[in-house]
Amino acid sequence: DSQWTYREDLKTEEDLWANFRYILEQNNKDRLDGEGLSDSEFEQVKNQLQFSSFYKAGEWLVGENGKVMVHVQRDMEKLHLVVMNHEHIAGGSSVYEVINQYKALKSDDEDSTDVRDRRFDVTLMINGLPMIHIELKNKQHSYMDGFWQIKKYIGEGKFTGIFSAVQMFVVSNGVDTRY
């Protein structure tokens, strides 16, 4: 029985943030005293997950003492919320999800080279965070077409926001696969 759940309902950035928020709140009920995050508190979380590079995201994902945390100021108290616990990998409170056909919207910035919406093939998420991005091609195309597509998406700024946490890219044409 697979631990991975296919989430056909997650297609937009808003969907992904709402899903991440739900998982974060579920995994931190004790720290939140049963009270969900307010919108302003969740904005604090989102701001901490705007990584300037995949490397910076990787540094954060190492965590401290096996726990990856975000911090939220609530009234006079600072809450330390667990995003991932390395002890719970492959079990425990970890949530594993698969999405496909995610719609990465074009930029509103007039000066951007990002001129159109894009659809990502497959993404694997852990606790609501996109970790592995997969581009698939058919056998008539080289797996390198997937590589160039990812490179184009990076240049267009598609891997920002919640997708700035991605740690691995996989390309495949069904014959050759690279990561």
Spans of model-derived segments:
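An alpha-helical interface "stripe"
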Residues: 1-179
